[in-house]
């Protein structure tokens, strides 16, 4: 017997509601989604009833390489014959190899890595790094951003995630995203770091002004604070370059990567930084540890992920399919009056509608048309569109047909927007 389909769909949903989250179960019931993933392969998800969806959510980039990529699965299976998670207290060949590969692929002189399990943990360490190195306390971050659900990462996120758990760690100062003047005013002699997502996904993928990060870099240099870039979603080829920040020709002090580094099969994250920023750890090298961070099985998988995503043919495919989707989305924008703007770098895409509530409506419409996509939680006028980076011509043709169908469904159900706004 396999690992899916051991129970019927109704029984699974009931057990999930009772023992995992009645609130998520209720939400999906309210919007008419009863999808329970079973088989998954490449760009596709199948539920227990055989219904097929193209995964254009990718769990925020976890499935950049699609589901169960054959090279990734083969690597993990072979590694299980020899390795386990390892011991984070000891020197590790696998962590050394992965860190070496990351240093090779990082922009500028970023050459050192501390590993974690998820993006929030990696952001937490980036903030520890900034405070430990500079001796300062203040962290500047963007309103509407999202960096994770853990301590420091949560404190640097939007109010809707922080408020139920306050008081949180002090010293965090919010500025509007893309506003260099606001950053300049906020940064002072007690600022340890400025922290941004290169393009904030949860905020709806607004593209920063072209000179924004150049100005942020200058401000950080002038004030002696660190520039931290959260590349959890924009990194690993998603934008057509290895790292999203490369589009803006700036080298930060710290880059955080996670999600896609896992290959979709083994959780791992990395905080990558310039040599010397961890000088505060000289006195106690064990002041920051992570039991499962940089597990040796995960390192082997992540090394294979980097090998695949750094291939020029891979990045060229992202750029090529991104251009094809840009043309398709441009035509849909012209055809449907509720589409306001297409925000795009490579295959990192936000479809901006005319008002809040349209993002969820288009997401539901996509589901009924055969595509899995989600809305931006901090701007519900936007639907995130993140197809796997392995899509080719056949998949683009599928997207053309199904996205047009979803737009038509949304257009015919536009009266639901007000209801959705009240529900959220």
UniProtKB/Swiss-Prot annotation:
Source domain of life: Archaea
GO terms of molecular function: identical protein binding; pyridoxal phosphate binding; transaminase activity
Top-level class of the enzyme under EC nomenclature: transferase
Modified residues (N6-(pyridoxal phosphate)lysine): 259
InterPro entries: Aminotrans_3, Aminotrans_3_PPA_site, Class-III_PLP-dep_AT, PyrdxlP-dep_Trfase, PyrdxlP-dep_Trfase_major, PyrdxlP-dep_Trfase_small
CC cofactor: pyridoxal 5'-phosphate
Cystine pairings recorded for this chain: none
PANTHER family: ACETYLORNITHINE AMINOTRANSFERASE, MITOCHONDRIAL, AMINOTRANSFERASE CLASS III
Protein name, as recorded: Uncharacterized aminotransferase AF_1815
Species this chain originates from: Archaeoglobus fulgidus (strain ATCC 49558 / DSM 4304 / JCM 9628 / NBRC 100126 / VC-16)
